[in-house]
Amino acid sequence: MSVSSTPTRLPNPYRPEGEIVSARLLALESALDWAAAARVAAPWVQAVRDNPPPFWAMESLLKEYPISSAEGLALMRLAEALLRVPDAETAIALTADQLGRADFDGSGDKVLARLSSTAIAMSKHFLPGAAEGSGILGKLGAKTVVAATLRAVQLLGRQFVLGQTMAEAMKEADVARKKAHVCFSYDMLGEGARTDKDALRYLQSYADAIEFIAARANKTGTLGENDGISIKLSALYPRYEDAHRMAVLDTLVPRVWTLCQAAAAANINLTIDAEEVDRLELSLEVLEALLVRVQVHCPQWTGLGLAMQAYQTRALELIEHLTALARKYQVKLMCRLVKGAYWDGEIKRAQELGLPHYPVFTHKHHTDVSYLACARALLAVPDAIFPQFAGHNAGTIAAILQMAAKTGAPFELQRLHGMGEGVFREVLKNPLIRCRVYAPVGAHRDLLAYLVRRLLENGANSSFVHQPVSYTHLR
């Protein structure tokens, strides 16, 4: 290992999957009563089935046109690209190309299917170059379809972005709070920085967001009752990778520390989002550098957090390391447990490199087992970690509640804005359960890349839209 390499803190992620899963299952044997969890979750699932989401909701759209079908892929590709098209003629051509590849004639007779089929049949009828659509009427028809599609895309966008600005987002958050006792973690939309100019722009965006949140935060109350912010380290430095470790520590850490200071002064939490497996060790080094500063300058602040991915083969070892860090620096950490959003990329990278194993679990049920094993481990260290469980599966939530009741450890549930509303409507009937909504904020043009990437990359495995309301099993 070269002098500039990131110190190894965790075991090799490329290990035999079967051995890891067997150990996780063994750890859960005495921790969970599966039948009891199923009984708790069953009425939540039935309530969601009895009160399905509206026809225009993303869950309905994906059920009608799943992204594993040609129709679903065409709609998602169109949604991702349409708002970035500079002129109407190109938009018409794009609509013609994408919708012309799919066949929606087999749709059912639901309202959504009828509306979608009508719009798409109309667009096919007026495709540029078609006999019926070659004249002015045809072009007007095609433009009408494009306009309608744009409106539909914007409607979908509003389901996943809380607001295009922080002011809009906080206004929407106030409306949501009237319906349920929830708080929010705001995420400023955008991909990783490509230049330092990008990084400084993202830094300012995060700083402005913290200022907005701070204006409404209770400075003397419980931190968990305030809204918070999520940040992406790759957005704050353009070469966030092990080969540039020293530059990361010299430049990125001070940038993140300025955000931490502002968050601590406002009594809000700041969570570092999870990224790719090969960046995890570097993220831990950044986290430890921040903990050194927190211990000295704001030891009373308990809002520094890290998101961790259950699909990683070394997720449990990560919890052990985070626990050791928290105890070493006497700073309680927040830990957001998620399934993971980069599955396809991790699998592809391991295949391209010819690695003997994968750094993530290759089966969805293995990730589910890992998630529950990680939840058990997080609940076992309340002195060091405050767990935040992100997910929308009724069975998983019931299992977490059961394990938490045994330990008495405090925790909160989290969901993604626009997803899981039906399940959480039932879960939050218990006023003692805390929920935080992960809420993207930004322009729709930024949302679409984020949304479609997650849909296309994760639709076939454990994504947040996979079987959202049709629970066929609870374990």
Describe each PLM feature range.
Residues S2-P52, M58-M188, A193, A199-G221, ...:
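Extended, charge-enriched "interface" segments that sit outside catalytic cores
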Residues E29-L32, G141-V146, H181, I231, ...:
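Short hydrophobic/aromatic-rich motifs at helix boundaries and adjacent loops
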Residues T144-V153, K232-R239, R349-L353:
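N-terminal small/glycine-rich loop or linker at the start of catalytic domains
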Residues L162-K179, L189-G190, T195-E276, S283-V294:
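Metal-dependent enolase-superfamily TIM-barrel catalytic cores that perform enediolate-based chemistry
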Residues S185, S230, M334:
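Short hydrophobic-acidic sequence motifs that mark active-site Asp/Glu residues
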Residues Y237-T271, E275-V469:
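Active-site capping/gating regions of soluble enzymes
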Residues T472-H473:
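Conserved small/polar residues in nucleotide/adenosyl-binding loops
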